[in-house]
Amino acid sequence: MPVILNEKKQAEYIIEKGEVGNKPTSTLFLLAKYYRQKENLNKEQTFNKLNEFMEKNYKNYNSATWEDIIEDISKKANKYPLREIDYIEITKSEIDTIRNVCNIKYEKLLFTMLCYAKLYNKISDKNNGWVNTDIKELFRVARVSVRYRNDKFLYLNDLETDGLISFSNKNDNLNLRVTFIDDESEVILRVDDFRELGYEYLNHIGDGKFIHTREFLSTHP
């Protein structure tokens, strides 16, 4: 499922359009967070709202089958803050650093990792550039394809050697950290959609034809 920057607006869009999407559980969890945190509904009220939403919008909905799932979602939704981020800002210094790599695949990957790192920095002021996203997802969103699976780690090792990213010292932690974030430089780009970051980068440098739309995401994978 793509990253949603503004979950409040996305929840309101889903309610208005009645879109369950291909991952109903993810949709329900987002709506539950909205009902609990923005409409201040309790667990029981949230349960009823979610049940009504599914009855109205999910074909062949069986309330008995979904009862335990919706009850659990309604209970946990208050533990995870509803994200309300309109965009993340990219600076001239950051883009210049990426352009200096002079390899379009590496550039798209670095731009994607930078966007995720700055998103996580907005979510937590203690994040310090770390990217808690699956490597496979980063390559997918960056639109960087490799011939063999292990090639992904060769790419990352190259970027680490150049000092652009670093890895956790813990053997069981695959998270990476972007080391060239510079919030003091001039802001030259605002990113409000994480679906196609590789194409977003190409558009910015003038090599892309990707049309950026403002339509909100459906909760599709």
PLM region descriptions:
Residues 1-110, 114-206, 215-220:
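Modules that initiate DNA replication and primer synthesis
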